[in-house]
Amino acid sequence: MFLLYSIMNTYFLFGTTDWATLNFLVSVCLDNDYLYNKNSLFFTFFIFFLAAVFKLGLPPFFFFKIEVYKGLPLFVTFFYSVFFFFNYLSGFFFLFFVFFTSFFVYFSYLLFFFVPVFVLFFFFYLTTYDNLNCFFSISSVINSTFLVYLLASSFF
């Protein structure tokens, strides 16, 4: 819902969802016009970033487990989840840094806030082998789905 909201809000505000066009519109002075206010666009991108965090399954936003991967060894779930996780994350950061240079300062503020929270919760949550295996398995399912969406969006 957050992703749908952010995409629809961006389209209704600017009439486009093209990343390069949005970066150009933000780089010019848009503070005078009410419809093209930078604050509403920053809020939309914050919602988009939060939705990406939810969909990635980063802690502390997942408290559920998948029972399918219980029988697999830890190495299999680790490799599968890390491969898709870094593919999605590198694609997202590449698109963000190439097309959204106007948002670099705000994005670094978000990372400065979210990364320590994720790291602390990661170490508190992963105290047992069972939780570690479930962590990698749930991340792999979510990230593999988003990798397909990311590749589809780059081709179409």
Curated annotation (Swiss-Prot):
Q: Where would you find this protein in the cell?
A: Mitochondrion
Keywords on record: Mitochondrion
One GO cellular component term of this record is:
mitochondrion
Name of the protein this chain belongs to: Uncharacterized mitochondrial protein ORF4
